[in-house]
Design a protein with these regions (language model features):
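Short, composition-biased motifs enriched in small/polar/acidic residues
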Residues: 221-293
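Conserved ankyrin/ankyrin-like repeat signature
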Residues: 34, 65-66, 98-99, 131-132, ...
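Ankyrin repeat boundary/linker residues
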Residues: 48-49, 81, 114, 147, ...
Length: 293
């Protein structure tokens, strides 16, 4: 009997806390009056259930009025669940423009990153939500943000056949030849057609490939072939062969991650030679040259 009583008490405690939080239940039902009632009782507006706050749930469900009520009562617009999802990530994923506008107006970070580096813009580009892509960019979203695997929003839009978003990103100055960690560009992703893709997706990706080409897009292999070979002569003397009329940037780095352009040359069909013996803090150990036009 004692064991049964303890088990029953434990079950009641669980029902009243993590597994059945009344404010979460009201949010998930889309019950505005129910949410207000729980707030009037003193419910914790940032209480988490299954890693999410009530605002996460309101955003995922597209419940704009509930989201506004929660924010007005102290909900954290930039709250993270365990994997780094913020409410704005969810609005971007599910295409809830009104909620996204509300969150941004209330101070949501448009460049917040999940643990894998994904921003709201990556998700909007992946799922084809053009209006949200435009909203995010207008409010300062980084069009060249990269995930942990090096993918940009343009990779996602190109790879999933969202031509309008590709056009929008390029119009906003995205790097058309950004490479991910496997050295694939957005053009590589657009050109990669899955046999299971529906006909309209295949057609869209062909159009995207042509559009990227018209705007200077190249595959990773093509970019590698265009990369001039930088030859080192002694410690600080370098040279490379430059094609006539092409523009080259010489860059240096101390960690192979952060590169800075230190010289720009216009090729004349000959060998460019230069010395680089400036003092650096921190010291620069790596140099490269890339053709930009």
């Amino acid at each position: 009997m004692k064991h049964l009583l303890l088990t029953t008490i434990a079950a009641v405690l669980l029902v009243g806390t993590v597994f059945a939080d009344p404010i979460h239940d009201a949010v998930n039902r889309g019950d505005l009056a129910g949410v207000q009632a729980e707030l009037d009782k003193g419910a914790n507006v940032n209480a988490k259930m299954w890693r999410r706050t009530p605002l996460h749930s309101a955003t995922a469900g597209g419940h704009t009025e509930i989201a506004e009520l929660l924010i007005d009562n102290g909900a954290d617009v930039n709250a993270n669940e365990d994997y780094g999802w913020t409410p704005l990530h969810l609005a971007a994923k599910y295409g809830h423009r009104e909620v996204a506008e509300l969150l941004i107006a209330k101070g949501a970070d448009v460049n917040a990153k999940k643990k894998d580096g994904w921003t709201p813009l990556h998700l909007a580009a992946l799922y084809g939500h053009t209006e949200i892509v435009e909203l995010l960019i207008t409010n300062g979203a980084d069009v060249n943000a990269k995930t942990e695997e090096g993918a940009t929003p343009l990779h996602e839009a190109a790879g999933w056949g969202h031509k309008e978003i590709v056009e929008l990103l390029i119009a906003r100055g995205v790097d058309v030849n950004a490479k991910n960690d496997l050295s694939f560009t957005p053009l590589d992703w657009a050109a990669s057609v899955d046999e299971e893709d529906p006909p309209e997706t295949k057609a869209a990706k062909r159009e995207i490939s042509d559009f990227l080409r018209k705007h200077g897009g190249k595959t990773g292999a093509e970019l590698k072939a265009l990369m001039p070979r930088l030859v080192q002569h002694g410690r600080f003397a370098f040279s490379f062969d430059a094609k006539e009329g092409k523009i080259y940037e010489v860059q240096d780095s101390f960690d192979l991650l952060n590169w800075e352009t230190i010289r720009i040359y216009t090729g004349a069909g000959d060998t460019v030679r230069f010395d680089e013996d400036r003092d650096h803090d921190p010291p620069q150990w790596f140099y490269r040259v890339k053709m930009v036009e």
